[in-house]
Design a protein with these regions (language model features):
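Post-Walker A helix-loop "phosphate-sensing" segment adjacent to the P-loop in P-loop NTPases
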Residues: 24-34
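A glycine- and Lys/Arg-enriched "phosphate-lid" helix/loop adjacent to the NTP-binding pocket
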Residues: 97-160
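ATP-dependent small-molecule kinase phosphotransfer cores
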Residues: 36-116
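Walker A/P-loop
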Residues: 16
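Hydrophobic anchor at the beta1->P-loop junction of P-loop NTPases
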Residues: 5-7
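Phosphate-binding P-loop
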Residues: 1-2
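ATP-binding Walker
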Residues: 12-13
Length: 160
């Protein structure tokens, strides 16, 4: 059974809070949960790139995102999914990455439709199709309010 639940949404949309609340409830039901923050969090490559987010051109950005995501999937997500009674709660996966990049392409009037890339990676067992994707979409005013209160970070600053 694929116990892989992904939470997608922009910064400050409530993904982490929702994931933590769900994790508590799942543990009450007798299952183990693993919270995984995803791209640009755990690998040296991802941490290095996170510091330079917004300073690289889009093809390089896409390459870094997917390389880091592939490493994260192989080294963190897949091993946990082999454990019995374990549910991986993923804070962003490939939907957020492809959507951000597509939206940026639309903004600069360039075709950055890369949705076929994660699809090919899933079909070739490089990335994993989530058993459930949860899209956190609060009203825009709430996002703005939360973003104003959020700490400075290359990721948040990129989307401000």
């Amino acid at each position: 059974m694929n116990n892989f639940i992904v939470f997608e949404g922009i910064c400050c949309s409530g993904k982490t809070t929702t994931t933590k609340l769900l994790s508590e409830r799942i543990k009450e039901l007798g299952y183990e949960t693993v919270y995984n923050h995803g791209a640009m969090t755990y690998t040296d490559l991802g941490k290095k790139f996170k510091k330079n987010l917004g300073k690289k051109d889009m093809p390089i950005t896409v390459s870094y995102f997917f390389t880091d995501l592939i490493i994260n999937t192989k080294n963190i997500i897949k091993p946990y999914l082999t454990k019995k009674n374990t549910i991986v709660l993923q804070d962003r996966y490939f939907d957020a990455i492809t959507t951000y990049i597509k939206a940026y392409g639309d903004y600069i009037k360039t075709d950055y439709n890369i949705y076929d890339i994660p699809k090919a990676f899933v079909e070739n067992d490089i990335l994993i199709e989530p058993s459930l994707s949860v899209f956190c979409i609060p009203p825009f005013e709430i996002i703005k309010e939360r973003m104003a209160k959020s700490k400075e970070s290359p990721v948040h600053d990129f989307y401000r």
